[in-house]
Amino acid sequence: VLFDKREDYRQELVPSGGLFLTAGADVQKDRIECEVVAWGRNRESWSVGYFIINGDTAREDVWNELTDFSRRYFEHSSGAMLPISRFAIDSGFATQQVYNWVRKQPLNFAMAIKGTDSGVTPLGLPTKVDLNINGKKLRRGAKVWTVGTSILKSELYQFLRLTQNEDESFPAGYCH
């Protein structure tokens, strides 16, 4: 069924319904995998591209490449250039490197996330993870957001099952 829903649109081009971009990254030992998603009205979404940054994630140059990637602009079908508005990165592997990278990013741009199956909400409140020498949490230190993976996976599967309306419009949450 999912195969039958596929659409033919150019990767790395934001479609006309896309209003802003987000990105998510997963860190592995030998690479960082990233997806950029365009979001439109009513949570309609398009995968703009899937990118792999190869290299040992213990090395600084891999993280510098991630920084360069996160600053990319993507062409909108209107000709405008859109930046990535928000960047989530999983901190389950290479946790300290993820926190270090997030700290270096502009305020409210990058967020370290940690998935949990026991979450009762899709996205929890941030938890400060940086401490000073006395064990007090730093006000402007790195934070990690808990992500309810079971809830989000269930929601994603529901969105993937949606079909185009008879009038050619798309229902809320439709994934292209």
Per-region residue spans from a language model:
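Mg2+-dependent endonuclease catalytic cores in nucleic-acid-processing enzymes, primarily RNase H-like
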Residues: V1-R6, L13-P15, A23, N42-H176
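Active-site cores of enzymes that catalyze phosphoryl transfer or operate on phosphate-rich substrates
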Residues: S16, T22-R31
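Short acidic-glycine loop/turn motifs at beta-strand connectors
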Residues: Q28, A38-N42
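Structural motif
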Residues: E33-E35
